[in-house]
């Protein structure tokens, strides 16, 4: 259960060599350090006892700091060690401001001194020094400057390798790379809601578990109102106010312990805020919400029998009001199970640096950039347009942190965004019928006034019938001879003539007679 960035830090400090013997020796040292210094939550009492017995002890743990204005001092909280209100100097807090922003993982020099009192209370735990394992400061301006030295493709590969993927490996083509980047958008866009359903072992939860300490991976059925939103007794805001992203793993099982969590989640997914009786009133949060799960059937089979939300928990899988708040449906079935060759051995950003980069990008926004070059089609309603803009914004943040991009870049991301939101809308149409009839998503180039429609790869019918509005005089129908059924395309055009009917395209007298009878019927009844 050791976070990846903790391992990276220790390995980098002991195994930075090409000498195989020294690497093996370094790995053994890392194992010893973790065994002696890394704190598992169940060992908290033992660690406190060691501090008392030895007077001083060095640990690897997550530390956060809060200000106590009544006493005009700072208190440190050591998470896994379950140490509350440890003494810490103002200078240490000033040197590491992220201690006040949710905390950081660090190597912590602790001391136990039973003579330290505040008023009549004893506060024996003291933080003497910390050596951050995560970055305690981060400069986004340097990222923007360094980005200029990379092409777009080079930067994309760097991002993917930093996340652990090898973009040049078999099976990770351009399409899959774009989908893997989409997994990062909830980490750079606040209050972004996404669903990914797909096969097992395709890394759906990996990003949120291993790549960033700012995401919470929640097992199915563990979500409670107090844990997610607010504790009415204490007034403490829950996970939506503490994390950048919350990923519900195995969302095909039960999602929430409390039945009233669903309406609260609807409110939160819509506006980023919620209200609940008791303390707090209207409460806001910034956490993005991700629902991951497995599909146990081919997607074609699911679409034949139901809809693509059907594998999700029965709490929400037919709730159109809930599902309409999903910004993007990532087609996880396109991402196959990863082989060892799909994981990179090349250089990328260290995990702590990469997680800070993703967190820093949340402050930017490119929400309006679509309007510089394109208009959205008439079928996109408010929630559709909002979702599409946020997906485009996320891709620009990831691939163009310096803010330099072209119209072609925006169009590329816009097509992906329209597809991801259209997939949501198509399932809503299957569930809710004509309330969600407007699914022909398109965009209009402001320069050429050309309208481009975006379809879904899994909708096989698009190969037979155009997935765009048909031209006047064109329609499709089904016909059969009793044994076979086929699709026919009918085109009607008006051309100058002499008023006589001419039938072409068939030698069947029966068909010709049927057409003549139809024409005569229309003439007789047209008035």
Description of each model-found segment:
Residues 456-527:
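Conserved P-loop NTPase/AAA+ ATPase motor core
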Residues 340-342, 368-443, 450-467:
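C-terminal helical "lid" subdomain and adjoining coupling/linker elements of P-loop NTPases
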Residues 1-166:
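Extended, charged/polar low-complexity intrinsically disordered regions
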């Amino acid at each position: 259960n050791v976070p990846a960035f903790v391992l990276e830090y220790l390995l980098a400090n002991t195994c930075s060599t090409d000498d195989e013997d020294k690497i093996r020796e370094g790995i053994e040292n890392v194992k010893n350090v973790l065994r002696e210094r890394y704190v598992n939550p169940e060992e908290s009492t033992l660690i406190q006892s060691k501090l008392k017995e030895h007077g001083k002890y060095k640990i690897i743990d997550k530390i956060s700091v809060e200000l106590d204005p009544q006493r005009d001092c700072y208190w440190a909280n050591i998470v896994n060690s379950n140490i509350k209100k440890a003494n810490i100097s103002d200078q240490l807090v000033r040197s590491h401001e992220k201690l006040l922003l949710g905390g950081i993982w660090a190597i912590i020099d602790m001391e136990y001194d039973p003579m330290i009192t505040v008023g009549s209370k004893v506060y024996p735990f003291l933080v003497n020094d910390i050596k951050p394992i995560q970055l305690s400061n981060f400069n986004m301006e340097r990222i923007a400057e360094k980005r200029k030295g990379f092409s777009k493709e080079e930067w994309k590969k760097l991002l993917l390798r930093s996340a652990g993927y090898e973009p040049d490996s078999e099976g990770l083509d351009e399409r899959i790379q774009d989908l893997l980047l989409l997994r990062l958008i909830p980490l750079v866009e606040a209050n972004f809601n996404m669903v990914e359903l797909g096969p097992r072992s395709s890394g759906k939860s990996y990003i949120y578990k291993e790549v960033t300490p700012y995401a919470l991976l929640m097992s199915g059925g563990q979500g409670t109102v107090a844990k997610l939103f607010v504790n009415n007794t204490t007034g403490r805001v829950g996970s939506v106010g503490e994390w950048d992203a919350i990923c519900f793993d195995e969302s095909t099982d039960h999602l929430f312990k409390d039945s009233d969590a669903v309406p609260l989640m609807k409110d939160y997914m819509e506006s980023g805020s919620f209200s609940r009786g008791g303390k707090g009133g209207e409460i806001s949060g910034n956490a993005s919400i991700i629902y991951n799960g497995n599909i146990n059937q081919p997607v074609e089979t699911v679409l034949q029998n139901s809809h693509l939300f059907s594998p999700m928990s029965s709490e929400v899988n037919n709730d159109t009001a809930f599902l309409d708040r999903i910004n993007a449906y990532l087609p996880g079935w396109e991402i196959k199970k990863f082989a060892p060759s799909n994981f990179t051995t090349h250089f990328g950003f260290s995990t702590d640096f990469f997680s800070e980069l993703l967190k820093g990008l949340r402050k930017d926004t490119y929400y309006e950039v679509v309007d510089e070059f394109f208009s959205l089609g008439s079928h996109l309603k408010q929630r559709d347009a909002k979702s599409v803009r946020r997906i485009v914004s996320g891709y620009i943040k990831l691939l163009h942190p310096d803010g330099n991009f072209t119209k072609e870049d925006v169009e590329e991301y816009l097509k992906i965004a329209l597809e991801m939101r259209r997939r949501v809308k198509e399932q809503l149409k299957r569930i809710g019928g004509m309330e969600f009839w407007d699914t022909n998503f398109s965009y209009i180039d402001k320069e050429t006034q050309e309208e481009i429609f975006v379809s879904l790869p899994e909708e096989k019918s698009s190969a037979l019938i155009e997935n765009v509005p048909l031209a006047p005089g064109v329609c499709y129908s089904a016909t059969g001879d009793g044994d076979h059924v086929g699709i026919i395309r009918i085109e009607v055009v008006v051309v100058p003539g002499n008023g006589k009917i001419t039938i072409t395209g068939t030698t069947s007298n029966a068909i010709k007679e049927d057409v003549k009878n139809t024409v005569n019927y229309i003439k007789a009844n047209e008035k």
